């Protein structure tokens, strides 16, 4: 391993730059730098040489040309193991550059601004930065490239431990990370430019929709023992910049490694539970809620959710949107086996009780508002892309289409079961009362079959459906679903409407004395 003698540091994100440069200086490394980075280091007392002074060529064209010079790129790309390269570099006075620390213009932050013009976006496309990054990454056997400031402490420690040298393994891993960095950067630029509207040449073009060429980057979190089934291989990746409050931000506090199915089910549970503004519990099995409830505290919410379907809850995923206390965890562990327990926070007592079940996976996930920009679904040879279903309704959005108006309690229950239905696989029917699901019918090819299943679930749980409310994620194609609901004693229904037989459905509600409200919004989930 050869010691690093000269480094070039030019950063947009300067986090930790001063401390890292101080370490390099102590190791006798000569530091080249540009613009704001050079000023930051100089102000901190770190000796730096401006790139313009090093090359003898001034920065020009409003900063567009700073590092695009043979003395820079020759110093990065030259192979120390080839006599011809060494001779040419000596002939032209090109010295080795052994370490490059570069991250790129903040293009994402620029285009996120509401009044970003095309000119603003173009001017924030980095040219010199990616060129140096790729040059250093290509020549990894002789040059180290650092693109992530989070790597500074580990790199500094290795340099100090090895007399200013980095191992081949470290340099190769940094190279791989660098190429991923530039690929993600170029993909982001492509996504932006190919998604602009037809008025792209106007001052402030609008994002028309989906990119003409869709580029996405993810970072591997873990390889898994297997996929959905034992004969399938699998891994879990997270977005480069995960949406606020998304599952990918989880912190595992205890338990076995998460499986493919654990993560899929945990995501379904988390998306559902965080949609409630009051304390809530969601129990999920095979990506479907089998029990949901809201209450004044987590213990009561769990008891109500569990009571919906004690059989299906076995081996399920249990999610809360409030801090979970010891009493709640004790009740859960006394009642059932679970795969995953998740919440924004747990008390010390809760964690102590959970620790007795060492295989249970306990996750803390930040409770923040946010959603993925796109939802993706692979099909054979292609990809379906859509915006997430984040639509929420209030009482003011609903239209009563029956003769009978809902009571105040029914209004509350209708909004509750409607929200739950959004997270149930279609065809979805949800019965509930008093902030508790009484029966959930999911994933059936016929809506009336889902209705019958929801009724049977309530019956099996010993829950009286008289006076309960029902939600359907899509319209009733025939009145038969309403008739089955009426047989259970349910007195209020919420659904989108939109069927060619809507009037027959509305008339059926009136025949049964049911209050019926429509949303005008469908919540299919496949």
Curated annotation (Swiss-Prot):
PROSITE patterns referenced in this protein's UniProt entry, alphabetically: MGS (PS51855)
Protein's UniProt keywords contain Hydrolase: yes
One Pfam family, short name: AICARFT_IMPCHas
GO annotation (BP), single: 'de novo' IMP biosynthetic process
CDD domains: IMPCH
Domain notes: The IMP cyclohydrolase activity resides in the N-terminal region.
Family from the record: Belongs to the PurH family.
Annotated HAMAP family: PurH (MF_00139)
Protein name (Swiss-Prot/TrEMBL): Bifunctional purine biosynthesis protein PurH
Species name: Neisseria meningitidis serogroup B (strain ATCC BAA-335 / MC58)
UniProt gene name: purH
């Amino acid at each position: 391993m050869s010691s690093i003698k000269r480094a070039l540091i030019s950063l947009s994100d300067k986090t930790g730059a001063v401390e890292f440069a101080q370490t390099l200086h102590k190791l006798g490394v000569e530091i080249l730098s540009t613009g704001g980075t050079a000023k930051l280091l100089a102000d901190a007392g770190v000796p730096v040489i401006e790139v313009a002074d090093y090359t003898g060529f001034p920065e020009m064209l409003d900063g567009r040309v700073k590092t695009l010079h043979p003395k820079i790129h020759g110093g990065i790309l030259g192979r120390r193991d080839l006599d011809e390269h060494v001779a040419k570099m000596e002939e032209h006075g090109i010295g080795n550059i052994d370490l490059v620390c570069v991250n790129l213009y903040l293009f994402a932050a620029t285009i996120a601004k509401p009044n970003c013009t095309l000119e603003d976006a173009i001017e924030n496309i980095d040219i010199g930065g990616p060129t140096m990054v790729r040059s250093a990454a290509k020549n990894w056997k002789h040059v180290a490239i650092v693109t992530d400031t989070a790597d500074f402490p580990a790199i500094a420690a290795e340099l100090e431990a090895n007399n200013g040298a980095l191992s081949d393994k470290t340099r190769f891993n940094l190279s791989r990370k660098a190429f991923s960095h530039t690929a993600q950067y170029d993909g982001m630029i492509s996504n932006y430019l190919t998604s602009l509207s037809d008025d792209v040449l106007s001052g402030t073009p609008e994002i028309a929709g989906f990119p003409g060429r869709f580029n996405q980057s993810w970072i591997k979190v873990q390889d898994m023992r297997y996929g959905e089934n034992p004969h399938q291989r699998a891994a879990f990746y997270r977005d480069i910049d995960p949406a606020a409050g998304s599952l990918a931000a989880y912190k595992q506090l205890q338990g076995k490694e998460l499986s493919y199915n654990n993560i899929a089910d945990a995501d379904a549970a988390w998306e559902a539970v965080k949609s409630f503004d009051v304390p809530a519990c969601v129990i999920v099995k095979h990506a479907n809620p089998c029990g949901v409830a809201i209450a004044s505290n987590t213990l009561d919410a769990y008891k109500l959710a569990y009571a919906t379907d004690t059989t299906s809850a076995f081996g399920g995923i249990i999610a809360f949107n409030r801090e979970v206390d010891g009493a709640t965890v004790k009740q859960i562990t006394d009642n059932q086996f679970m795969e995953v327990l998740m919440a924004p926070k747990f008390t010390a007592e809760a964690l102590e009780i959970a620790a007795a079940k060492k295989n249970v996976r306990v996750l803390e996930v930040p409770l923040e508002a946010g959603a993925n920009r796109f939802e993706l679904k692979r099909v054979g040879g292609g990809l379906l892309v859509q915006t997430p279903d984040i639509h929420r309704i209030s009482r003011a959005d609903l239209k009563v289409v029956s003769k009978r108006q809902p009571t105040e309690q029914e209004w509350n229950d209708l909004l509750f079961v409607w929200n739950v239905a959004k997270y149930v696989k279609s065809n979805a029917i949800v019965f509930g009362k008093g902030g508790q699901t009484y029966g959930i019918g999911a994933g059936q090819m016929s809506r009336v079959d889902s209705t019958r299943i929801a009724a049977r679930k309530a019956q099996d749980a010993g829950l009286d459906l008289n006076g309960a409310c029902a939600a359907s994620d899509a319209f009733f194609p025939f009145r038969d679903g309403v008739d089955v609901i009426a047989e259970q004693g349910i007195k209020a229904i919420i659904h989108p409407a939109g069927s060619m037989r809507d009037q027959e459905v509305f008339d059926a509600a009136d025949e049964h004395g049911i209050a019926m409200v429509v949303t005008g919004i469908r919540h299919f989930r496949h």
